Amino acid sequence: MHTLIKGILEEILEEEVIVEYPKDREHGHYATPIAFNLAKVFKKSPLAIAEELALKISTHEKTQGLFDSVVACKGYINFTLSLDFLERFTQKALELKEKFGSQVKSERSQKIFLEFVSANPTGPLHIGHARGAVFGDSLAKIARFLGHEVLCEYYVNDMGSQIRLLGLSVWLAYREHVLKESVTYPEVFYKGEYIIEIAKKANNDLEPSLLKENEETIIEVLSGYARDLMLLEIKDNLDALGIHFDSYASEKEVFKHKDAVFEQLEKANALYEKDSKIWLKSSLYQDESDRVLIKEDKSYTYLAGDIVYHDEKFKQDYTKYINIWGADHHGYIARVKASLEFLGYDSNKLEVLLAQMVRLLKDNEPYKMSKRAGNFILIKDVVDDVGKDALRFIFLSKRLDTHLEFDVNTLKKQDSSNPIYYIHYANSRIHTMLEKSPFSKEEVLQTPLTNLNAEEKYLLFSALSLPKAIESSFEEYGLQKMCEYAKTLASEFHRFYNAGKILDTPKAKELLKICLIVSLSLSNAFKLLGIEIKTKISARD
């Protein structure tokens, strides 16, 4: 509806028009502040301009039957949609069913490469990884729903010093807990019960001869063994959140193409040698300083691997590349973009979204750390505690780039203080009414909407506004808008439900038809959030 109204107004006024929702629902369904901009051009008051435009719009042939009223108010132009228009849009939504909200013009379709999570396979996924994981998965769902082509990839950092350290940590745990030797651990190593688990499992799975080689060979064997086990566990953790990737890219495999990439950087005059190191001239592209790619010992930095990986990605020529990183990687953006420019790519095609920290509470106290993983809260522990749907909803309920703190006990409450419960409860109420109704679903669907009051019309309008919520969520990377939409719609429905009996009125079929649209919109919104909406739920509020 929003796109349609905007298009009609722009055609009539021959100006770009901002169409927004009024702060006060009594002012109508939509509003535009265009008169404020035009007032400066025509040197008239915004109210005078608004009155002229309101008359022009209301009398134009393209708006006949579209609006009940077009009113100038304090410089704004407020629009109230006609019931006839809402009825036509309702029929279209009911015909689209689970596709309602997916309308997108084919020429706007994009090919998107979405990389997220990409946690090192050196330990189980913790709660900090979950936020970016859930966001990326839902962003992909929304993008595909809108007609875009999306590839979701997990970049596996399966080489380098952290993988060797994993193997060393397992080897030391093996010596201590299997061979019962006295062991001195280094200052930095991976700790936690999972390391001991891997060591004991290696004792059962690996050929005994492999663990009797020289220490460097043993560490190499255990590095690969532990890495593979961790990657399997990571996939299980993601599965518990309902997340599945289209592909997993191995850093070890990708880095085999490093020579060609470095040759290209050399040709672009992007490298120089200083202090026995090879540097990237990233400061030429807004980076704070140049960056080391090859260290004195001839080993490569993490950045070198990232550059080779991004070269592999950009060779595939997607419309847009989206990376979801932890907020602590903010400084990496400029250096990666610099490398893309040196390699001849358009770095503006890369968008990096940063996920801020998560702080979990339970009974207003910090959530207990996992003994298995050391100083982390594991995804699996929280999913087992509150369920994947509640966890997904709360992670998506705030902007990705803002800090998130919540008490998991809120997600266990069966009352209006628990937002996901309250949305489920709205849908449950609708399905209970439909079961109790003497009318068949077909009767309800075929009933024309002819006799709705202002509140009923507004509830219908809110339910039909799902497409705008979906579009805004994607375009602004603001998935919290989907959560806000679902919460607001559920709240409006509960107010409507509590205001009076629905089944015992002459227009019961009309009201049930509104309820069907509300249920459809809530269901479609939740599906895009990766949540299955419930049709049966108990209530204690």
From Swiss-Prot:
Subcellular localization(s) per the UniProt record: Cytoplasm
SUPFAM superfamilies per the UniProt record, alphabetical: Anticodon-binding domain of a subclass of class I aminoacyl-tRNA synthetases (SSF47323), Arginyl-tRNA synthetase (ArgRS), N-terminal 'additional' domain (SSF55190), Nucleotidylyl transferase (SSF52374)
Record lineage: Bacteria, Pseudomonadati, Campylobacterota, Epsilonproteobacteria, Campylobacterales
A Pfam family recorded for this sequence: tRNA-synt_1d
EC top class named in words: ligase
Lineage top rank: taxon: Bacteria
Subunit field text: Monomer.
Catalysed reaction equations from the record: tRNA(Arg) + L-arginine + ATP = L-arginyl-tRNA(Arg) + AMP + diphosphate
EC number(s) recorded for this UniProt protein: 6.1.1.19
Record motif 'HIGH' region, residues: 119-129
GO biological process: arginyl-tRNA aminoacylation
Record key words, sorted: Aminoacyl-tRNA synthetase, ATP-binding, Cytoplasm, Ligase, Nucleotide-binding, Protein biosynthesis
Glycosyltransferase is among the record's keywords: no
GO molecular function, one term: ATP binding
Record bears the keyword ATP-binding: yes
Species for this entry: Helicobacter pylori (strain ATCC 700392 / 26695) (Campylobacter pylori)
Protein's UniProt name: Arginine--tRNA ligase
PANTHER family (alphabetical): ARGININE--TRNA LIGASE, CYTOPLASMIC, ARGINYL-TRNA SYNTHETASE
Gene Ontology CC, one term: cytoplasm
Similarity remark: Belongs to the class-I aminoacyl-tRNA synthetase family.
NCBIfam families xrefs: argS (TIGR00456)
